[in-house]
């Protein structure tokens, strides 16, 4: 990783230099952030690092630290490492693979940073604590023009970032295997989640997003995170959407299983998996993401016809918008330091935004695919009352096989999701590549 990071920081130095020159700035100060206190409490929420800090300094536990960059000299990290007996004192990672790319200053008191900040009015501040920035003399605080430039750069990953996301596949896949086994052993959602965390060597505090561990109809809740503590004696289906992080970079993987491998629902899962690989094989640099989402909606329409859920032609099902009730989310999203990574709608460094079309309000990416973009491919098929009820009260209701839908509602839904990186010749499936290395893939 050392060589890849050297190339990564070299590229970012050039980006910073361009940002400073175009915005007439002499330097950039980035604060990593601090844990927030709960209201009227002395307990904090888990610390979540400023992604712009993590972009330059791949150490996501670096709380209350600072970076200074001028685009020319080696960046300086001001690492906060106080003496403490209440908590485990932070240890500066001065022997890490990235350490040689920085000048180091160790701070034992957070107030010390003030003496290092020279001429703050000629610099910009990026961070959450705007009051802190003002108290230190900054007047250019999170300027949108600077953020836009950073966000757009973040949407095109370096080889270091791609490797980190690839490495994050392994822990997640090990967790998925353990969760699958726990489901087929009849464990509860709570126990399945524990199995995932143990196998992936994570805790609920450092997973990239709240694990979605859903049995039966809970799969119809897209972001279900409640967890039943008691086993379900009539388990029919299991959906798990869970990832891991390496150096702050996330994986985001989803699988669905049928309790009865010979059921029609199991056949639907298999078909959705085939659609996933099929659409990944079609991904091409320069083509807009919306076109692939539209293709997926058309395939959902085909499934609704093929499995006799809707008694219209696939073309009619798509044109009438019926498929949207069964696939309400987007095909996927950019992936990186944030699970829903920056600049999914941003079309250029200036910040021009292209919102999703009205018919697909949940689409998270309206970009043309570009080389070294990392995205999720997230296909879904659900039985959600909130979306089906309007159809039941519409003129289209007579074309829908409500008896069969009622039979399938207890399954909740299907989601399957892999992580891919765009290359000049097409998409590279990072999840499948890791599955093959772990000898988990049968595709």
From Swiss-Prot:
It holds the Pfam family PepQ_N. Keywords: Dipeptidase, Hydrolase, Manganese, Metal-binding, Metalloprotease, Protease. Its cofactor is Mn(2+). GO terms for biological process: proteolysis. GO terms for molecular function: aminopeptidase activity; metal ion binding; metalloexopeptidase activity; phosphoric triester hydrolase activity; proline dipeptidase activity. Its EC number is 3.4.13.9. It catalyses: Xaa-L-Pro dipeptide + H2O = an L-alpha-amino acid + L-proline. Splits dipeptides with a prolyl residue in the C-terminal position. Belongs to the peptidase M24B family. Bacterial-type prolidase subfamily. This is Xaa-Pro dipeptidase. It comes from Actinobacillus pleuropneumoniae serotype 7 (strain AP76). The lineage of its organism: Bacteria, Pseudomonadati, Pseudomonadota, Gammaproteobacteria, Pasteurellales. The gene is pepQ.
């Amino acid at each position: 990783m050392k060589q890849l990071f050297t190339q990564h920081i070299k590229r970012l130095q050039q980006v910073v230099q361009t940002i400073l020159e175009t915005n007439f700035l002499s330097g950039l100060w980035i604060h990593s952030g601090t844990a927030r206190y709960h209201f009227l409490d002395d307990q904090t929420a888990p610390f979540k690092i400023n992604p712009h800090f993590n972009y330059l300094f791949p150490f996501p536990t670096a709380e209350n630290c600072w970076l200074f960059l001028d685009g020319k000299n080696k960046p300086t990290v001001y690492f906060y490492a106080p003496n403490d007996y209440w908590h485990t004192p932070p240890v500066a990672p001065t022997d890490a693979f990235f350490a040689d790319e920085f000048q180091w200053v160790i701070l034992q008191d957070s107030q010390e940073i003030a003496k290092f900040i020279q001429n703050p009015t000629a610099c910009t501040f990026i961070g959450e604590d705007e009051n802190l920035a003002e108290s230190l003399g900054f007047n250019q605080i999170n300027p949108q023009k600077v953020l836009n430039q950073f966000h757009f750069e973040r949407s095109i990953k370096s080889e270091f970032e791609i490797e980190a996301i690839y490495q994050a596949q392994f822990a997640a896949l090990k967790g998925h295997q353990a969760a699958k086994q726990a489901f087929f052993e009849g464990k509860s959602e709570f126990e399945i989640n524990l199995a995932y965390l143990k196998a992936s060597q994570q805790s609920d505090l450092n997973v990239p997003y709240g694990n979605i561990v859903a049995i039966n109809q809970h799969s119809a809740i897209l972001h279900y995170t409640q967890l039943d503590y008691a086993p379900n004696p009539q388990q029919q289906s299991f959906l798990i959407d869970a990832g891991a992080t390496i150096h702050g970079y996330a994986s985001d993987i989803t699988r669905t299983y049928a309790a009865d491998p010979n059921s029609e629902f199991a056949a639907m899962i298999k078909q959705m998996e085939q659609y996933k690989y099929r659409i990944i094989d079609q991904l091409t640099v320069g083509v807009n993401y919306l076109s692939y989402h539209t293709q997926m909606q058309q395939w959902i329409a085909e499934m609704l016809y093929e499995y006799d859920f809707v008694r219209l032609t696939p073309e009619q099902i798509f044109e009438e918008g019926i498929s949207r009730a069964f696939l309400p989310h987007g095909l996927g999203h950019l992936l990186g330091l944030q699970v829903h990574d920056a600049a999914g709608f941003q079309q250029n460094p200036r910040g021009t935004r292209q919102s999703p079309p009205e018919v697909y309000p949940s689409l998270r990416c309206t970009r043309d695919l570009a080389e070294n973009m990392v995205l999720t491919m997230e296909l879904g098929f659900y039985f959600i009352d909130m979306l089906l009820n309007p159809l039941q009260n519409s003129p289209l209701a007579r074309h829908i096989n409500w008896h069969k839908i009622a039979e399938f509602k207890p399954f909740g839904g299907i989601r399957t999701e892999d992580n891919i990186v765009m290359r000049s010749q097409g998409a590279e499936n990072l999840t499948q590549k890791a599955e093959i290395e772990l000898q988990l893939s049968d595709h």
